[in-house]
Amino acid sequence: MSRLKEKYLNEVSPALMSKFGYKSVMQLPKVEKIVINMGVGDAVQNSKALDAAVEELTIITGQKPVVTKAKKSIAGFRLREGMPIGAKVTLRGERMYEFLDKLISISLPRVRDFRGVSKKAFDGRGNYTLGVKEQLIFPEIDYDKVSKVRGMDIVIVTTANSDEEARELLTQFGMPFQK
């Protein structure tokens, strides 16, 4: 069992039960899944860019990403419907906890001038969205092999009913929010 999962069961659950006064363990908010999306705009001209992005996501998450395709044609971007323009991974279960642990304890502190993640990035339904400007914050990525610095969106989906509950859950996990 991963470190964060154990922490959730032994420390976070009792703390949340007492703070929000839940009657049942089933009411507890928990992390459902983590979706990591990488948009590769230059895949339109250069198809190798997408392969590099897919490989990087595979290295970071330990799971093969799905290639996302354009839903609509946009002439201004020279984009046709069905063209591959990105990659995404949905992590659940053990891999999800491993990734979250790695993100909180190793990757986020490696961001330059890091002062904590925004408190305002909750969506009102208890999900948290985080933008990462470069893939180099992950220790698995080799700096010399990177052709282009790419960012990604990381969405942490929780079963919490409100932003307050989700914020408390992530704070208990050790997510470094801004003061």
From Swiss-Prot:
InterPro entries referenced in this protein's UniProt entry, alphabetically: Ribosomal_uL5, Ribosomal_uL5_bac-type, Ribosomal_uL5_C, Ribosomal_uL5_CS, Ribosomal_uL5_dom_sf, Ribosomal_uL5_N
GO BP of this protein: translation
GO cellular component, one term: ribosome
Pfam families named in the record: Ribosomal_L5, Ribosomal_L5_C
Keyword RNA-binding attributed: yes
Listed SUPFAM superfamilies: RL5-like
Organism superkingdom: Bacteria
Record has tRNA-binding as a keyword: yes
Protein's job: This is one of the proteins that bind and probably mediate the attachment of the 5S RNA into the large ribosomal subunit, where it forms part of the central protuberance. In the 70S ribosome it contacts protein S13 of the 30S subunit (bridge B1b), connecting the 2 subunits; this bridge is implicated in subunit movement. Contacts the P site tRNA; the 5S rRNA and some of its associated proteins might help stabilize positioning of ribosome-bound tRNAs.
Subunit and partners: Part of the 50S ribosomal subunit; part of the 5S rRNA/L5/L18/L25 subcomplex. Contacts the 5S rRNA and the P site tRNA. Forms a bridge to the 30S subunit in the 70S ribosome.
Family under the similarity heading: Belongs to the universal ribosomal protein uL5 family.
Protein name, entry field: Large ribosomal subunit protein uL5
Organism: Lysinibacillus sphaericus (strain C3-41)
